């Protein structure tokens, strides 16, 4: 049976840096992979607030990465860069995709990360994935 994998990152490029090689390994094994990005906005500098990449640039870069990595599905959650929440809304939105794709393995951020969006993504993932048998951080 193919594994049903979900990779969850707070921002565009987090997933590629964090587990791009793991995605390729799963795709080589014939697994189904869903890429989930918690943010769907421009990327901004956390100190100055200056826009680093527009929403369209981010979307285009993620779509290119998803195609190159061979992911089967791409999903964006509606949260803003620097404002990824850990609350009922974020958990329920992520849980909807976990159920939709019948996911049995998840990869996400490490709990000890210093980035606040990464921490919120970790917490949201752990709550939404409480019934998923394999969660790796």
Predicted regions and their residues:
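Active-site rim/loop-helix segments in enzyme catalytic domains that contact anionic ligands
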Residues: 1-101
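Active-site adenylate/phosphate-handling loop in enzymes that bind or generate adenylated species
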Residues: 94-137
